């Protein structure tokens, strides 16, 4: 069973599908958020308020929903697997308010979708995936 590891919805169970989906492990999620939270504290940065988290290969939404649980304002999910999308929507509706998430049914790598982000001074991209050049 997959659970949220921290924040407001700590221990909340997430629906999953099958062995095809490999959610980010709880250890990796805890490590990721611990690192960025430590960085934010050290540099006096407001980490979550009025911020958007991009879950680029969302699967069932573990990373994005973890971000919402910890106080992120909004999550944008990208997922293109039809079976997984239904589980992702179910998980989002069990945790998020309707205005806290958007789901794009797209393959991000081949997408022609353009998203406009205003007033972004810096950003980071984090992925457990290895890409071939």
Summary of predicted features, one role per range:
Residues 1-65, 69-70, 80, 85-121:
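S-adenosyl-L-methionine
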């Amino acid at each position: 069973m997959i659970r949220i590891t921290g924040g407001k919805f700590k221990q909340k169970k997430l629906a999953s599908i099958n062995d095809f989906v490999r959610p980010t492990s709880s250890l990796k999620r805890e490590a990721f958020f611990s690192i960025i939270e430590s960085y934010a504290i050290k540099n006096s940065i407001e980490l979550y308020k009025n911020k958007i988290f991009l879950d680029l290969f969302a699967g069932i939404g573990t990373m994005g929903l973890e971000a919402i649980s910890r106080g992120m304002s909004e999550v944008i999910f990208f997922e293109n697997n039809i079976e997984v999308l239904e589980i992702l929507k179910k998980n989002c509706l069990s945790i998020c308010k309707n205005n806290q998430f958007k789901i794009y049914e797209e393959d991000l790598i081949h997408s022609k979708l353009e998203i406009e982000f205003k007033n972004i001074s810096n950003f980071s991209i984090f992925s457990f995936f290895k890409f071939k050049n």
